[in-house]
């Protein structure tokens, strides 16, 4: 289980000087899907990861050191909160720079063991999410895994949840509002970063 967490630093792009001795978990998804809120819920801290009032405005890569415990043994992992995709109203040139920085970071940051792709459970087949999934698969290494996490599932009824789970069998459904699915997600994160989820 996660017992504590703290903010470490922010980056604009990949920095080889910021190495990590720990496995890392990257949270990706389109703007306003709930990345920061999910990190806060998992770490049981309301304001650990800051949510921007303007979707897509925050374009920093934020790092958090997370201390976990499994069978009385403590260990560290890093959570990485990535900028949201596809929302920011900025110049085309600036957006291209952001995309290039993210592309370089995701491909070169070898300590990332788990990519958590957050998808709004009410909009499951948006082109931006399909493209993001295909993009990650193109450079995924054998020691890395993609996990689809459907957010805001408190907006769905039981039938809709069952249908979604049936269509995406290896996914997790979560709700920050009522904490649904968070324990299962926490277990997967810990097992994957420890190399136990093969």
From Swiss-Prot:
Cofactor(s) recorded in Swiss-Prot or TrEMBL: Mg(2+)
Binding site for Mg(2+): 36, 58
Entry-linked Gene3D superfamilies: P-loop containing nucleotide triphosphate hydrolases (3.40.50.300)
Keyword Repeat applies: no
A Pfam match: MMR_HSR1
Superkingdom of source: Bacteria
EngB-type G domain ranges (all copies): 21-195
GO MF terms held by the record: GTP binding; metal ion binding
GO BP term (any one): division septum assembly
Endpoints of the signal sequence: none
GO cellular component: cytosol
Keyword entries, A-Z: Cell cycle, Cell division, GTP-binding, Magnesium, Metal-binding, Nucleotide-binding, Septation
SUPFAM superfamilies named in the record: P-loop containing nucleoside triphosphate hydrolases (SSF52540)
Residues binding GTP, per UniProt: 29-36, 56-60, 81-84, 151-154, 174-176
Tagged with keyword Magnesium: yes
Family recorded in the similarity comment: Belongs to the TRAFAC class TrmE-Era-EngA-EngB-Septin-like GTPase superfamily. EngB GTPase family.
HAMAP family assigned to the protein according to its UniProt record, in alphabetical order: GTPase_EngB
Summary of the function given for this chain in its UniProt record: Necessary for normal cell division and for the maintenance of normal septation.
Official protein name in the record: Probable GTP-binding protein EngB
The species this protein was found in: Campylobacter jejuni subsp. jejuni serotype O:2 (strain ATCC 700819 / NCTC 11168)
